[in-house]
Amino acid sequence: RVLFRSGVISNFEVTERMIRYFIGKSVGFHWFKKPRIAVCVPSKVTDVERRAVEQATKSAGAGQVFIIEEPVAAALGAGLDISRPCGSMVVDIGGGTTDVAVISLGGIVVSTSIKVAGDKFDDAIVRYMRKNHRINIGERTAENLKVILGTACADTPESKLTVKGGDMVSGLPTEIEVSSKEMYKAMSECVTAIVDAIFYVLEQTPPEL
C-alpha cells in the first residue's frame, strides 16, 4: 500500500522493483526479448500519472507498455463482450479508487473515478472502533472485519466476529465482539459515496444505451 496512493504511484523506485520482480516470475530473469506488458490505471488519472506508470514499467524491463483503464480490464476479466453496441456498467472497487464506467463498442462512454475504495473502508472501520468501542485495531483487523462482516444492506442477516485490539483507556490488550450491523454503520458513508458515483454515471449515460 505504500507503493500506491489513490490508485497511482507514490514510490517510483520500489514500484519499479516490484514490477521487475513480477516480470522475473512470469518470464524469467534472463529474457532475450523484452516482454510486452499491460498495466491497469484508474479511468481518471492525469497524463503525468499515466506517464509515471509507463516509465516505471519500462525501467523495470518492459519492451512495450499498454495502459488499460481499470473498468475496461475489469469488464474483460468478467467475460463481458465490450464490443457490442449496448451499454455495460462496471463498478471496480479497488484499494485506492473506485471506478464506475459504462462501456460500449470497445470503449468507455462515460466514467468517473473517486478516491473512496477498500482503504477508505478500512480507515472508516478503524475510526468506528475507536469512537464506539474505545479500542485501537490495526489495518489487517479492519480488513478482516470488512471482508467477513462488511455489508451495504441494512437488513443483512446479523453475524458476529470477535476481534482483538488495544484498549484506549488502559492500553492493555482486549477483545470485543463486533456485529455486521455495526459494520454497516461504519461503512455507510463510503457506500453512499460509491452509490452517488454510480448515479452520476447513469445520469450522464446516453439514453440510447
Predicted regions, residues:
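Conserved Rossmann-like nucleotide-cofactor binding loop
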Residues: 96
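Nucleotide/phosphate-binding catalytic cleft detector across ATP-hydrolyzing
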Residues: 1-93, 101-209
